[in-house]
Amino acid sequence: VWDFMSLVKALQIDLTSVKLPWTPTKDNVSRRLINEIVLGEESDIDQEENPTSHYELYLEAMETIGAKTDKIKKFVSNVIECNDYKVAVSKSDIPHAAVEFMNFTFDVIDTKKTHIIASVFTFGREDLIPDMFINIVKSLNEKPGSKTNDLLYYLERHIEMDGDEHGPMALKMISGLCGDDKEKWNDAVEFSNQALKQRIKLWDYISSQI
């Protein structure tokens, strides 16, 4: 969830004007799409209708079900202190599989190629989530309990936003970024496949620890 937000912000930096003095960017459609996505991911609402990010929603849900969150909190604290991803990782106790997954994300960001970043965001993350989360929600609903309420809310918000809004927006964005450029579409396929392989490796590790 944390490194997903870094992908989102990388796209916002590339597709919008975040420098002073402000000037309009060329791609009006992608500018609007990424700002809509950032609004939902960074400033959604919790169950009490308080503004919050999906990262914070997820963290709260994990704490409610009794999952340990000390390592991610320490890592983010290190990021704030160092303002450097690699230094923060070196100072944190993070499972190797999670580090490999995040390293891939930041390698993608470091390409500085917006269509590649967008393809990993779209096909490696955003487009997968609704179908994946629907099955988890079905499973949780079979065993209802107050401890899972926050997690259910988080999952259902993602299903609603990603399935109905963010998913279609992301597909429209990648289509606009790649256009008729065959090389860019080849990049999109290659990096999307790599992203999916990285996700499978991470899930396999998580499965081995359960």
Predicted feature descriptions by range:
Residues 2-210:
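Non-heme di-metal
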